[in-house]
UniProtKB/Swiss-Prot annotation:
GO MF annotation terms: ABC-type vitamin B12 transporter activity; threonine-phosphate decarboxylase activity
GO cellular component, one term: plasma membrane
Annotated protein name in UniProt: Cobalamin biosynthesis protein CobD
Source organism (scientific name): Geobacter metallireducens (strain ATCC 53774 / DSM 7210 / GS-15)
Pfam families referenced in this protein's UniProt entry, alphabetically: CobD_Cbib
Membrane topology: Multi-pass membrane protein
Amino acid sequence: MTEAGAVVLTAVLLDLLFGDPRWLPHPVVAIGKLITVLEKFLRRLVTNERVGGVLLLLLAVGITAGAAWGAVRGASLVHPLAGVVVSALLGWTCLAARSLHGESKRVADALVRGDLPEARRYLSFIVGRDTAGLSEPEVWRGAVETVAENTSDGVIAPLLFFMIGGAPLALAYKAVNTLDSMVGYKNERYLHFGWASARSDDLANLIPARLTGLLMTLAAPLAGLSGRGAWRIMLRDGRNHSSPNSGIPEAAAAGALGVQLGGTNVYFGKPVAKPTIGDPLKPLDATAWRGTVRLMYGAECLLVLLAAVMTTILTITD
């Protein structure tokens, strides 16, 4: 196994074993604080909001990637093994499979024991929609949609960028992702200032989202689900979403599970009608949630396996 392969595998295993320990300082928290400071500074310095937003994007991503590179490089100068360890640790912080499983499991466990109010409360921690009035199937839908969508931007995308460019590129992606979640809104405050961040997030997830859909399709039969259904619904309904990317993994999951996602959600008290994704062949329940979690882990394992095979082939032919 190559050094890069060992670093990637270590990061994945650390995430699968430990998730995001609350005691461990998380780079995304630091990135969020950096964005807040930069936004305040740039709003005072630059009058053109689009220019300010572009500068915010460049500075936040550049500082984040530079800090990651400096940390790995500095550790390597102390000892080569230290650089490997730091790189693996930084890569670990970019992955969210275990935490995504755990957070959605709290919702599922509450529903299984019949505590709908508690399930709604837990769901509110991981979705942007209003959850207070959701029915049980709607809560299950929220849990399934969250796992499916975040399989792309919480697992496959950061892992892909980590494989390509190590910790600096993976953390640069997390910076773009964090920028979008903080300033990528189409409201009066961020319509122009957050434009560059929102578009960059769409661009950064363009390939990973489609790769996630493909990996889910391949993982579906291994998870006891329908690969043919995943492929069919992904092609048919992958664009039934306001995001150019989020609909792809959601459609693949819906097709694999035989459930229907999407539809009307309530945001800040206002119903927002969205297109449906998939066909309601089966109910949204604990079985559907467990199937989505299996798809997430299956897609991640397939990406690691694919990378290992490609690396082996390149090593042999070199």
